Amino acid sequence: MVRIAIAGAAGRMGRQLLKATVNSEKAALGVATERSESTLIGVDAGELAGIGNVSIAIVDDLAKAANDFDVLIDFTAPVVTLANIELCKQYGKKIVIGTTGFSEEERVLIDLAAKDIAIVMAPNYSVGVNLVFKLLEKAAKVMGGYTDIEIIEAHHRHKVDAPSGTAIGMGEAIAGAMGNKLSDVAVYAREGITGERTRDEIGFATIRAGDIVGEHTAMFADIGERVEITHKATDRMTFANGAVRAAVWLADNQSGFYTMQDVLGLDDL
């Protein structure tokens, strides 16, 4: 049984992760953390998640609970995640990262940490989204050279980063399949007289509204036809279940940088 720690347990994803961990047949909840100023310190994690008492109280010091978990799942903020990575390095723990919005410099730090500990990092832990990434690679190889490629994503009003990590992941999958680097071909905003689009650019459009859990569409548009590959999430539990699955998988692997493609074995398709 893999003992899991949940960082940011009181957040929207944190509560779903608590449920997914407790409901898993292969994992057990070992630790649940929150910020030191949180009024929820000391509250039972199960009560917080609405699943009843689990005899695990919310704590504010992950280091003091280092003996109580094997893998940390972190869906928080870049500054918090980077600090938790250092803690995992110090105590020889493994980490599943669902946080998005890292800078290129911060991504380098994560890559370096993977030389010492095992890390799974993905922009999205849904099985369906990760299958979409693979489908996009296939579509880009067949259609990318002669179509206009656009990515449209929609999320709830509270999401703080844009485009979403999943949208960027879609762009990276497409660009990589075409032998390009996303940063060289991405267009994140259009306004005013922009002129005609170039053939090689990948455009992004972002919607923030209401309570949309997550919707992503990649469009390959030609004259006379277009192909759209879409994923719609209606419940955050799909992300939480995928993250717990990744944590269980990671427990059996050595130091290195892994993605959900590795967890699901999609690289073999």
From Swiss-Prot:
Record family assignment: Belongs to the DapB family.
Gene Ontology, cellular component aspect: cytosol
A Pfam entry, by short name: DapB_C
Gene that this sequence comes from: dapB
Sequence positions that bind NADP(+): 35
HAMAP family given in the database record: DapB (MF_00102)
InterPro entries, per database record: DapB_C, DapB_N, DapB_N_CS, DHDPR_bac, NAD(P)-bd_dom_sf
Name of this protein: 4-hydroxy-tetrahydrodipicolinate reductase
